[in-house]
Curated annotation (Swiss-Prot):
It is found in: Plastid, Chloroplast. It comes from Pyropia yezoensis (Susabi-nori). Residues 42-174 form the N-acetyltransferase domain. Pfam families: Acetyltransf_1 (PF00583). This is Uncharacterized N-acetyltransferase ycf52. GO terms for cellular component: chloroplast. Keywords: Acyltransferase, Chloroplast, Plastid, Transferase. GO terms for molecular function: N-acetyltransferase activity. It is an enzyme of class 2 (transferase). Its EC number is 2.3.1.-. Belongs to the acetyltransferase family. Ycf52 subfamily.
Length: 174
């Protein structure tokens, strides 16, 4: 696909040597004050399922069986989480994952940012980190499914609807 070739050639996402946590500098400029948020990006696959469930609940997602969530996480190629550290406590404030055939294709799933942290650019950070890691693995096609109200967000990050007329198809049991 021509689009993806141009997208990745023109992408300004740079590789970095990431350890387990990478500190983000996040400014919250609401209410005429600037507040620094102590947020860390992690690619650690050990996610607390109950914290993830709380995060998903905070945005109104339908509850999913934890047993199946655990299986989905285990079978994910990449997991990115955002953790706020405050004093001795930590809180999961963002999450996304990708599955892949590890050759050509990957799909991004479960992108979620806690409502208190939306509008700070954290969703963009998570998506860019996923794309960066997938591109380092030489994945050439990255897909995702988006609710209608967030399509414009993904378009701003370079995703396109129906590239070259390609349509997603689904099969559901009857």
């Amino acid at each position: 696909m021509i689009f993806w070739k141009n997208f990745f050639q023109n992408s300004n996402i740079n590789a970095s040597s990431e350890k387990n946590f990478k500190k983000l500098i996040v400014l919250d400029k609401t209410c005429d004050k600037i507040e620094f948020k102590d947020i860390y990006l992690s690619s650690n696959k050990n996610i607390n399922l109950y914290e993830l469930e709380q995060l998903c609940d905070s945005v109104g997602w339908v509850k999913r069986p934890l047993k199946k969530v655990k299986i989905a996480l285990k079978n994910s190629s990449i997991i990115i989480s955002l953790i706020q550290k405050k004093d001795a406590n930590s809180k999961l404030v963002g999450f996304a994952r990708a599955t892949s055939d590890n050759g050509f294709n990957a799909t991004i799933w479960d992108v979620v940012i806690h409502p208190d942290f939306q509008g700070l650019g954290l969703g963009k950070v998570v998506i860019h980190q996923l794309i960066q890691q997938l591109r380092q693995a030489e994945i050439s096609t990255i897909t995702l499914f988006a609710e209608p109200d967030v399509v414009s967000f993904y378009k701003k990050l370079g995703f396109i609807k129906d590239p070259d007329g390609v349509k997603g198809m689904f099969w559901y049991p009857r």
